[in-house]
Each structure stands twice: as structure tokens, then as C-alpha cells.
Amino acid sequence: MNRCPITYELCGPRPYSLKGLRLLSPALKDLANLGLSAGELRVEAMARASKMSVQGVQPKLSAILNIKKGMFDIVDRNGRYILKPQHHIFPELPQNENLTMHLAATIGIRVPLNGLVYSKDNSLTYFIKRFDRRGQKEKIAVEDFAQLAGKDRDTKYNYSMEKLVRLVDDYCTFPSIEKVRLFNLVLFNFLVGNEDMHLKNYSVIVADGKVELSPAYDLLNTTIVLKEGAEEIALPLKEKKRNLTRNILVNYFGKETCGLTDKTIERSLAIIQAALPGWFTMIGISFLSEMMKDKYRKLLEERTRILFG
């Protein structure tokens, strides 16, 4: 029996569940494989890179959902989705990112619609709906924290979490609310081994007249992909990038730096702790290989012991 790569629910002989298809569009009856293989998608991404407004280490393509044809069409402009095919060096990034985004959603972290779609060679490609677009052509105002801090791609790691919190205070309409969201995201990224949350992976968005943190994106367990000796956080916290402790994460960052109350911190920790059993279940039914599932579980177990004892 197949499992839907959008919702993770069992879907019989079909490649996608009806629920998964309806998340993309209520009118979508089926979803065809992408017309290119993983290698061909990477070549296409390189050829179109200068036309993409969203760039990074992973190869990316802009796409629209063609409901009539029941498939994603790759486009140069006005795309509503981003496609990320398999990487030629780092294994299983699409499955990794999809799983990690699913885990984030279980604790209330806002994430855009995302999932996996089969390619011509049956490899899995990650898709995510753009949150900076509305309707056919309207762009929603979004700025990443590198822009807010006056940094660029070459200096996106030259900052600290303490300074990032000050940017939240300076730019967000209701910083006290956004600092709770930031705290939850930092705890989550520590637990799942996302050590690459540099300035360009945080953004603010104008929504309903308010400036707030954007939905989360680029969440994945980088620790199990990279070689040993990886750091635990991209931007130093209390001048540390590794050997983070509960005291640093909870008391120093949550209470002192973000100014959160004990009650707020306890609520965040309780929500995460209650979700942990479900996380291990979700890892088990994810589309990662058994080897990568095992690495993900072990890392999560290690980080859980640090945060919760």
C-alpha cells in the first residue's frame, strides 16, 4: 500500500491521497510525475538560476500548478511553487526537508504548503508554495534578516542570535508575540539538528498591515547530512555555536534575551515534549531511507536529552 508524499497517510494503490491533492487544489484529480529526472531537473535549475528570485545551495526551480493537466509546469517568472530536486552531493535533502517541515507544523510553527512529488525517474522532488505571492501577480512584502541587518550572502553568518532578537524588537509590530515564535523555532531547530539557520533563513512579512515573522522555510536536519564536527547553530548564542545547553537555550535565550515569562517558556516546552512521541512515529513513516531515519532518530534522542534531561 502506498503512502502519500504530501500528507503521509496511506493511499492504497494511488501515488497521492485525495486529501493531499485537495491541499494543492480542490479541483485537482491527480498529479502526474514531473517530466524530468533528478539530473535533468538540476541541469534545468542551473540554466534558469539567474531568473530565479530565490537562490541558495540547493538547486531550485520555479513552477506553477497546471490543474487542467494535473502537473507542475516549470516557469521562469510568476511561479507559485518552488521545486527542489535531489542534490548531487548531499543525499535525500527533499525527503529531509519535507519531514522536518512536517515536524515543525505539529508544534504550531507556521509553514507553507509543502510536500514531495515524483519525478520522471521516480526520484522525489520537494515542493513548497511561495508565501510571498498572492493571486496571479501580486507580490507580498517580505524581507529577510540579512537585508534588515545590512548583510549579504557572503556575510549572512556574521551576526548573533542576540542581535537578531533586537531586529525583531525594531521591525515587528508586536515583538513580544514574535519573540515567542522565534524561541519556539530556535528550540525546534536545535532538536532536529538544523544548524544552518543563517540570516537569510529568517524573514519578516507584511500581513494584514502588521510586520511579523514569515512562515518558516528551509527547515531540515543538516547535521545528519554534513560530516562529523558540525556546529549546532548558525548564528552564535552566548558566543557559542556548539555545546549548547538547556540553560543557554531556555534561561539565557528564552528568558533573558527574549524576555519571555516562565509561564510562556513552560508552555512552549510542554508543547514540544508532548509532540515528541509523534515525531518519532513520523520519522518512521517518512520517505527517508532506513539509514537516514536511524540517523535522524539518534540525533533527536541526543538533543532531547540535552533539552529535557
Question: Model-derived features: where do they sit?
Answer:
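Regulatory N- and C-terminal appendages and interdomain linkers associated
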Residues: 1-41, 45-47, 210-211, 281-309
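ATP-dependent phospho-/nucleotidyl transfer catalytic cores
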Residues: 120, 127-191, 236, 251, ...
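A short beta-strand motif that forms the metal-chelation/ATP-contact edge
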Residues: 125-130, 215, 277-281
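Conserved kinase catalytic-core segment
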Residues: 89-105, 160-224
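Catalytic-core segments of enzymes that bind and process phosphorylated/nucleotide-bearing substrates
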Residues: 144, 148-167, 206-263
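Mobile late-domain/C-terminal helix-loop "cap" segments
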Residues: 238-301
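Conserved ATP-binding subdomain of kinase catalytic cores across diverse folds
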Residues: 39-158
